[in-house]
Amino acid sequence: MKHSATSSEAHARATWPLPEPTLAYFPNARFVPSDRDLDAGAARPIRGGVAVVDDSPDFGHVPVLLERCVELLTPALTRRHPDGSGAVLLDATLGAGGHAERFLADLPGLRLIALDRDPSALEIARERLARFADRITLVHMRYDGIAAALTESGYAATESVDGILFDLGVSSMQLDRPERGFAYAQDAPLDMRMDPGSPLTAADILNTYDEAELADILHRYGEERFARRIAAQIVRRRAKEPFTSTADLVSLLYQAIPAPARRTGGHPAKRTFQALRIAVNDELDTLRRALPAALDALAVDGRIVVLAYQSLEDRIVKRLFAQAVASRTPVDLPVELPGHEPRFRALTHGAGRADAAEIERNPRSAAVRLRALQRTQAPQATGKGD
């Protein structure tokens, strides 16, 4: 293990430790577990107030529902040739490259186009996938840029891809690096940007948005029932001193959330941190734009798999997938009109879940919801009334 301090981490040391009353309800601030560790009980020690990150090749990343993803996508990737020759897999959220590595290893003829908004993740994945360098194209881009990424890679934006994978949410690499500011269990700058080049940070939101905007973000993106109370206290607190670290926010949440609520329903900071992260990274609107583009990119008989880890994302996926598999024949007609059949069919009944064995190996998989579709019809086969 190794760790070199940055200026932001030096700030984290300076504000460490959190006050003991806060630690009473935020005990993980002393030890920082990785939610993708194989050992559910493993914890990363704090040295000088900074979590030490294991520099292993996979950075602790354990691909979620890997076998199920392979089972669902492989038929589309091997329909031309058993080794994947002629097939293209689009990984819209590459991360550490765990899912992509498996497909590339299993299918020596497969080509991969992979996107990630985080340049650090791309570099990690580039190293991990180096032995497949002649078959991969890595693109620094948010996943709502699928059409542009395909065009830049020499493919059409529509009907050119055989398989698509989305593994949504924040990655373990981002959670495990204190300077990124994603985790409420460690003191760090209030950043939360998945792309460090993006202009908006969590501190910007906390220090500049008005009370109504803050309450709306906490309620809409975090489903936080104490959103108004928290927003009011944020505004009062920043009038005295701006928010700079996650410890500042954790301390405020300890004061704002009633004691009974702090003791039940999971970590009391979870909803606020989720809301800020979603707002900083525009995650939900990005997903709303990305999924239609992904469906357009699929060739006939191509397949898409989406892994979502929180209900707001899963609702978007569920709604858009339901629209994709619906007939376009007017509901008052008794028969299906030619050319109005659904363009997609569902490959899962509801949302797929991890089993107990996988959850024990990989605790992050407990939250996952998997949904998958197959394209059955090309857009140009539809009627004029579409």
UniProtKB/Swiss-Prot annotation:
GO BP field: rRNA base methylation
InterPro entries: RsmH, SAM-dep_MeTrfase_MraW_recog, SAM-dependent_MTases_sf
Predominant location: cytoplasm
Subcellular location, record wording: Cytoplasm
Residues noted as binding S-adenosyl-L-methionine in the record, renumbered to the chain: 97-99, 116, 143, 167, 174
Keywords noted in UniProt: Cytoplasm, Methyltransferase, rRNA processing, S-adenosyl-L-methionine, Transferase
Enzyme class: transferase
Family assignment from sequence similarity: Belongs to the methyltransferase superfamily. RsmH family.
Function, as annotated: Specifically methylates the N4 position of cytidine in position 1402 (C1402) of 16S rRNA.
The protein, known as: Ribosomal RNA small subunit methyltransferase H
Lineage of the organism: Bacteria, Bacillati, Actinomycetota, Actinomycetes, Mycobacteriales
